[in-house]
Regions:
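Secondary-structure transition/capping motifs at alpha-helix termini
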Residues: 10, 52, 77-86, 117-121, ...
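Mobile-element integrase/transposase regions
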Residues: 2-57, 65-72
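Active-site-proximal acidic segments at structured loop/helix or strand boundaries
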Residues: 140-192
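Acidic/histidine-rich, metal-coordinating catalytic segments
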Residues: 84-103
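Two-metal-ion acidic nuclease core segments, chiefly of the RNase H-like superfamily
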Residues: 104-122
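Active-site beta-loop-alpha junctions of metal-dependent nucleic acid enzymes
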Residues: 59-87
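RNase H-like two-metal-ion nuclease catalytic core shared by retroviral integrases
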Residues: 90, 102, 122-144, 160
Length: 192
């Protein structure tokens, strides 16, 4: 028994690195950041999307995480990417899930309608399995560390979103370690 217990302590979970074809998937998630908005320090919600093949990003700020912001974030992100992936990967947040969880979750009526209109499949992660959408989890941290430090001092949320779009455009010049092309070059290849 002791030997089995010792072996169990040494064995760790193994995860297969995820690999995606062009335009196969986008991962989406919410984050939170602090800004000085109109002279008042406050928390805002940051909407993050990452195209899984190219690594392209879309980030937008909202006052709250609700269904309207969720759907608007998806539409704006798809416009930014210039197309629709075959699937969008998200967690089990109430704004997207009517019932169930993980692979058995059922999308809310509005999210289902949006997915039908744009012809993508909504895919939900299993609970406590952050690695299933690790690309966008990394993006939330990246944006919080790089864009929101120091704390931005802006007049309006529209001004903040304009600066976030500029940040996304500059990110397209970034080269992801292990890739031969820049994010922007890979994004263009996704559109072909």
């Amino acid at each position: 028994r002791r030997a089995v217990a010792e072996l169990k302590d040494k064995v760790s979970n193994v995860f297969v690195p995820l690999s995606y074809d062009p335009a196969e998937a986008v991962q989406i998630d919410w984050g939170e950041a602090t800004v000085v908005l109109g002279g008042i320090k406050q928390k805002i919600q940051i909407w993050c999307m990452r195209e899984c093949h190219s690594g392209d990003i879309f980030v937008s700020a909202f006052y709250r995480q609700n269904e309207e912001s969720f759907l608007e974030g998806i539409v704006k992100g798809l416009e930014h990417f210039g197309g629709t992936p075959r699937k969008i990967i998200f967690d089990n947040a109430r704004v997207a899930v009517k019932e169930g969880f993980g692979y058995h979750a059922k999308a809310t009526d509005k999210y289902f309608s949006l997915s039908a209109h744009y012809a993508f499949k909504p895919v939900f992660c299993n609970p406590a399995q952050g690695h299933e959408k690790g690309l966008v989890e990394g993006l939330v941290g990246l944006v919080r560390r790089n864009f929101f430090v120091p704390v931005p001092n802006i007049s309006t949320i529209d001004e903040l979103n304009k600066k976030l779009l500029e940040y996304c455009a500059v990110y397209r010049n970034h080269k992801i370690p292990g890739k031969e092309l820049t994010v922007g070059e890979m994004t263009e290849n996704c559109k072909d």
